[in-house]
Amino acid sequence: MFDLLIRNAQVAQADGRTPPADVLCHAGRIERIAPSIDAEARETVEAGGHLLLPGVIDPQVHFREPGATHKEDLASGSRAAVRGGVTSFLEMPNCRPPTTNQEQLDWKLAQAAQTAVANYGFFIGATKDNLDALNSVQPACGIKIFMGASTGDLLVDQQSDLERIFANGERLIAVHAEDEARINERTAALLNDLTQPPPYEIHSQIRDTQTALIATGRALELSKKYGRRLHILHLSTGEEVDYLRNDKPAQVTCEVIPNHLFLNTHDYAQLGSRVQMNPPIREPGNAERLWAGLHEGTIDIIATDHAPHTLEEKDQPYPKSPAGMPGVETSLPLMLTALQKGQCTLAQVLAWMCSGPAEVYGIANKGQLMEGYDADLTLVDMTATRPVRNEEIFSRAGWSPFAGRQLTGWPLYTIVGGRVVFDNGAVRPGVLGKALSFDFTT
């Protein structure tokens, strides 16, 4: 007997075709895809002609465990993920204590094995003192460098330290590209003489376009100098797209997040600190240039940078208000809504959110709906239109910057390793994800 049979689905192919088919899953893999399958299975999902996608891989989340589990933890964050059709996530190291050695990585892996309902992988955080660990810990999806200070205590901004990290080892380096010196200069210029808390939109002026562009340029030059595999996280400006369009070696990839595609500085007026993040949301016009970067291939993939804080924390006056917002459970509906508005194609969504992240991080057998691949899937209702509601958010933060926005295309079922984990609004008990492995040799 097989584990799972999905009947009468529109099965999404990498080229955007959606032929009707049944999908048979067993032992965590897609066993067979055919127009009609007659087989006994422990569970049958009647897809009703809805669209079946490969599970989304979110390559940048902050699930806050250990150290800030009042905001999120691996259990709540992964529940939010599967609600949004995300079946695998890569989690960042800026927790407390930070993930900077094998002991901390092992702790996270053990915790995720007991609580995460999606598949999981973890970055190791770079400091100026842990060069040996950066290249020896296993398994890690990459090295995270904060070139500009953000949530947590990880910061590497001195050129000599960056040179040592890029020059030693072969593991992928993922950079938060904001220039710390310029942040400090802009902070002094714009905040030091104020007697009243400034408006939240000053955040986008402090961490301005040049703050991002300087750091992106530094990282790119280091990658070229040492031939090092580089991934630039959350591009936010049109200037970065222009820069990379003209000078992006084969070993360099980059991403954008929905916040920078669907929000801009006008949103501060209504949402205030809820849209404060690093790098910040930008002036109108940048989103169009980021979209162009996606379409032309300068930008490779989409992540969320899911970075939750409580509303009590977010409502503090600037600059005490922390940067970051939830996003893991709305990214796919946002992109499916964009698809239906003609901003992208299904093939592009699949490349940006499924197969692309698997390729960037060397994750085998994920990201495509093919026989022999892992049975990580999401069944979506492309006709379902409803607003994002804070009271329905699974993240422990309990809110979304997109609350009230009408989105079309919501997951009905999410399947991890051939087992249904999210079922029409609820997470089933007893299903856990598995640790991801990473191969950068191919």
Model-assigned labels for residue ranges:
Residues M1-E40:
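N-terminal metal-binding scaffold of metallo-dependent hydrolase/deaminase domains
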Residues A12-D22, E359-E391, R405, N424:
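Acidic, glycine-enriched loop/beta-strand segments at the rims
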Residues S36-L52:
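Active-site metal-binding motif and surrounding structural segment of the metallo-beta-lactamase
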Residues H50-T115:
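Metal-associated gating/positioning segment near the N- to mid-region
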Residues A110-A126:
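A glycine-rich helix N-cap at a beta->alpha junction
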Residues D132-F146, T151-I302:
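Histidine/acidic residue-rich metal-binding segments in metalloenzymes
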Residues P197, E201-R218, L222-G227, R274, ...:
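His/Asp/Glu-enriched, well-ordered alpha-helical/loop segment
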Residues V275, Y318-P319, P387-A403:
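Short, surface-exposed loop/helix-turn segments at secondary-structure junctions
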